[in-house]
Amino acid sequence: MGAAHSASEEVRELEGKTGFSSDQIEQLHRRFKQLSGDQPTIRKENFNNVPDLELNPIRSKIVRAFFDNRNLRKGPSGLADEINFEDFLTIMSYFRPIDTTMDEEQVELSRKEKLRFLFHMYDSDSDGRITLEEYRNVVEELLSGNPHIEKESARSIADGAMMEAASVCMGQMEPDQVYEGITFEDFLKIWQGIDIETKMHVRFLNMETMALCH
């Protein structure tokens, strides 16, 4: 997919589906070919050669997100064995900065899509709810690179954060009331007022976020 094909129907369709310009699609295609070894699809093992991911404590969750059928809009659960370039673009579109030409409704929709992507990273069993155990796993992985924080401390941090989430989402709970986990609606409440744009970037693919701006 070179410059000669930049105006092709295929590229125009991808522009419409992902919001990327033809130049951005060409740039992402070059990165896709690097990752895939010039093959038509990418498998999980292709991400083993990404230096910026090697030391990332949630590397496995980031890679898994690329193959999650929910993120690929191919179903409510399950993982794909491999992804093609259009799938790759679909995932990368979650990281695309909000366009300044968007109206308020479009901005809110884009923000919700980004948060849904993050929610799926936590909700590993695809049941639509982030349980305490799932939350603990993420926190423990995030803190695993810190030699000063033991596993029990990480669990305590996760437990405290989950209690705070319950407070935000349910208000004052009865002593015998059990908080079963964070739904996506709860997740939206927790992230209300937080700048999601600064939390999602693509540096692990050796591509600066600004390169994906219009």
UniProtKB/Swiss-Prot annotation:
Gene3D superfamilies cross-referenced by the UniProt entry: EF-hand (1.10.238.10)
Keyword Cytoplasm: yes
Broad class of the protein's primary localization: nucleus
Positions where lipid (N-myristoyl glycine) attaches: 2
UniProt KW keywords: Calcium, Cell membrane, Cell projection, Cytoplasm, Differentiation, Disulfide bond, Lipoprotein, Membrane, Metal-binding, Myristate, Nucleus, Protein kinase inhibitor, Protein transport, Transport
Residues covered by the EF-hand domain: 110-145
Induction description: Up-regulated during granulocytic differentiation in a ERK-dependent manner (is mediated by activation of ERK) (at protein level). Up-regulated during the differentiation and maturation of primary megakaryocytes. Down-regulated during monocytic-macrophage differentiation in a ERK-dependent manner.
Tissue expr: Expressed in mature megakaryocytes and polymorphonuclear granulocytes (at protein level). Abundantly expressed in heart. Also expressed at a lower level in adult testis and salivary gland, and in the placenta.
Keyword Transferase: no
Binding locations of Ca(2+): 123, 125, 127, 129, 134
Biased composition (Basic and acidic residues): 7-16
Gene Ontology terms for molecular function: calcium ion binding; magnesium ion binding; phosphatase inhibitor activity; protein homodimerization activity; protein kinase inhibitor activity
GO biological process assignments: cellular response to retinoic acid; male gonad development; megakaryocyte differentiation; negative regulation of cell population proliferation; positive regulation of DNA-templated transcription; positive regulation of gene expression; positive regulation of granulocyte differentiation; positive regulation of megakaryocyte differentiation
InterPro entries: CHP3, EF-hand-dom_pair, EF_Hand_1_Ca_BS, EF_hand_dom
Positions of disulphide bridges: none
GO CC field: cytoplasm; cytosol; lamellipodium; nucleoplasm; nucleus; plasma membrane; ruffle; ruffle membrane
Bilayer topology term: Lipid-anchor
Annotated function: Functions as an integral cofactor in cell pH regulation by controlling plasma membrane-type Na(+)/H(+) exchange activity. Promotes the maturation, transport, cell surface stability and exchange activity of SLC9A1/NHE1 at the plasma membrane. Promotes the induction of hematopoietic stem cell differentiation toward megakaryocytic lineage. Essential for the coupling of ERK cascade activation with the expression of ETS family genes in megakaryocytic differentiation. Also involved in granulocytic differentiation in a ERK-dependent manner. Inhibits the phosphatase activity of calcineurin.
Xref: PANTHER family: CALCINEURIN B HOMOLOGOUS PROTEIN 3 (PTHR46823)
Family listed: Belongs to the calcineurin regulatory subunit family. CHP subfamily.
Domain-level remarks: Binds calcium via its EF-hands. Calcium-binding mediates a conformational change. Can also bind magnesium.
Protein name (Swiss-Prot/TrEMBL): Calcineurin B homologous protein 3
Gene name tied to this protein: TESC
